[in-house]
């Protein structure tokens, strides 16, 4: 790995009460000697002036030095905590970069150093970014659990079980003349089924973590004046969209970020769908369809006071244009005017909810439906956060475990069982970074903040 000494601002760019510069690498102590005029004792706070190359004082603050390997990155680390003015931070950063052998850190490079120095695994490194970006208390708590190793521990337990079983299978292959037929005695099958059950549990928890991290994109669609913007306002709990009796009031895409019991929802209100002649409205309708095609779920809003034949036509025309893979929920709005009961039922394979966005009756039915449609389960203790790549790795591991079970129970093919288990181990180890390509590492860490 690179032994460069890197520096970056660890606090957000802009003005604040405190600004922190972080230096990591072999030359961290040399930076302290040149900028502070003093050799620092590890893990001791020092209040000192920060000096320019000509000896003039740039700022004064607290300096902390951590000697490798006892630091976040596993390298020598120096932190300078000064006043948070951006000019001051820039001057101090410029001063440090004048020292030979020091360069500006790439995004996520401090966390990458920590990963490469075995201070944390890849799932924990990703949890740092997730904790910073958490949009709810539950997401933050779950990210912290991942950072503390809860997710990694579950993966490592699975890997250990797979390694144990691989050893057992390969022993059966290497010693075929033993009196006991290890492949047929039932022990390998029992262990394999136990691993499959454990993996299923971790997959379910990871799915919850992915929902908590990434949320669900819900697009509200329908004809003008059906009550789309009113529903957006009701779900958001504020007047996010202008609501009038004039058809076509909403002409552009409106976005709101909300939470339902900790589950993040990206709610998108769109222009009313109709044959428009106004050029601006046409653009809004094109954008509406762009959002519809990228949605996790569509809420088609119908005005329940209109003629049922007309509503059936609206629904059939919309469904004819809708990409087949996108889930659809029918919302019959204005139940307070039509006299419909606020209920949820199934019709022809579609969920239909009658509600009133104006009075908010029946809206809780919609909230519960959105949670259930994503498979989200409220966990008061908090789980761990997971990413799509984690889910994909777990899914691949499950596929190869099932394949291994078939090879064992139907064909007694020990070599093929061992190969499937090797592939399972590889996919699981990708999650923690034990087996990970350099390209994947680059993609992951490049999405981090500069000073992380």
From Swiss-Prot:
Name recorded for this polypeptide: tRNA modification GTPase MnmE
Residue positions binding (6S)-5-formyl-5,6,7,8-tetrahydrofolate: 22, 79, 119, 452
Amino acids binding GTP: 225-230, 244-250, 269-272, 333-336
Details of cofactor binding: Binds 1 potassium ion per subunit.
Binding-site list for Mg(2+): 229, 250
Subunit structure: Homodimer. Heterotetramer of two MnmE and two MnmG subunits.
GO molecular function, one term: GTP binding
Any one Gene Ontology cellular component term annotated for this protein: cytosol
The keyword tRNA processing appears for this protein: yes
HAMAP family: GTPase_MnmE (MF_00379)
Function of the protein: Exhibits a very high intrinsic GTPase hydrolysis rate. Involved in the addition of a carboxymethylaminomethyl (cmnm) group at the wobble position (U34) of certain tRNAs, forming tRNA-cmnm(5)s(2)U34.
Gene3D superfamilies assigned: P-loop containing nucleotide triphosphate hydrolases, Probable tRNA modification gtpase trme, domain 1, tRNA modification GTPase MnmE domain 2
Needed co-factor(s): K(+)
Keywords: Cytoplasm, GTP-binding, Hydrolase, Magnesium, Metal-binding, Nucleotide-binding, Potassium, tRNA processing
TM annotation in the entry: none
Biological process according to GO: tRNA methylation; tRNA wobble uridine modification
Compartments in which it is found: Cytoplasm
């Amino acid at each position: 790995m690179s032994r460069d000494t890197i520096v970056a601002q660890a606090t957000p760019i802009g003005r604040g009460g405190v600004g922190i510069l972080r230096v990591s690498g072999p030359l961290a102590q040399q930076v302290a000697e040149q900028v502070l005029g003093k050799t620092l004792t590890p893990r001791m706070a020092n209040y000192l002036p920060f000096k320019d190359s000509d000896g003039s004082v740039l700022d004064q603050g607290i300096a902390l030095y951590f000697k490798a390997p006892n630091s976040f990155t596993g390298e020598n680390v120096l932190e300078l905590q000064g006043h948070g003015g951006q000019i001051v931070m820039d001057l101090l950063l410029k001063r440090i970069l004048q020292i030979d052998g020091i360069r500006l850190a790439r995004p996520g490079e401090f966390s990458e150093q920590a990963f490469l120095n075995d201070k944390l695994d890849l799932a924990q490194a990703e949890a740092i970014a997730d904790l910073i970006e958490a949009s709810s208390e539950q997401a933050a708590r779950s990210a912290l659990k991942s950072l503390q190793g809860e997710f990694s521990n579950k993966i490592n337990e699975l890997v250990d079980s797979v390694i144990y079983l691989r050893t057992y299978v390969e022993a059966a292959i290497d010693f075929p003349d033993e009196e006991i037929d290890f492949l047929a005695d039932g022990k390998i099958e029992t262990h394999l089924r136990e691993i499959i059950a454990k993996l299923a549990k971790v997959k379910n928890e990871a799915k919850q973590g992915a929902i908590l991290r990434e949320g669900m994109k819900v697009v509200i669609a329908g004809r003008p004046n059906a009550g789309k913007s009113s529903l957006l306002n009701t779900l958001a709990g504020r007047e996010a969209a202008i609501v009038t009796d004039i058809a076509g009031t909403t002409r552009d895409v409106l976005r709101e970020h909300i939470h339902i019991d900790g589950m993040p929802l990206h709610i998108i209100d769109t222009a009313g769908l109709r044959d428009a002649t106004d050029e601006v409205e046409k653009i809004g309708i094109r954008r509406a369809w762009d959002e519809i095609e990228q949605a996790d779920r569509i809420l088609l809003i119908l005005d329940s006071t209109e003629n049922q034949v007309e509503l059936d036509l609206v629904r059939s025309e919309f469904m004819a244009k809708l990409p087949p893979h996108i889930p659809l929920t029918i919302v019959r709005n204005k139940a307070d005017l039509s006299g419909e009961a606020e209920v949820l039922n199934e019709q022809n394979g579609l969920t239909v909810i009658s509600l009133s966005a104006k009075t908010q009756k029946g809206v809780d039915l919609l909230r519960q439906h959105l949670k259930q449609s994503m498979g989200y389960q409220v966990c008061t203790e908090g789980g761990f956060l997971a990413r799509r790549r984690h889910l994909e790795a777990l899914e691949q591991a499950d596929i190869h475990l099932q394949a291994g079970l078939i090879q064992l129970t139907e064909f007694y093919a020990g070599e093929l069982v061992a190969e499937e288990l090797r592939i399972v181990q590889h996919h699981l180890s990708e999650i923690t970074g034990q087996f990970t390509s350099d390209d994947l590492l680059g993609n992951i860490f490049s999405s981090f903040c500069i000073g992380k």
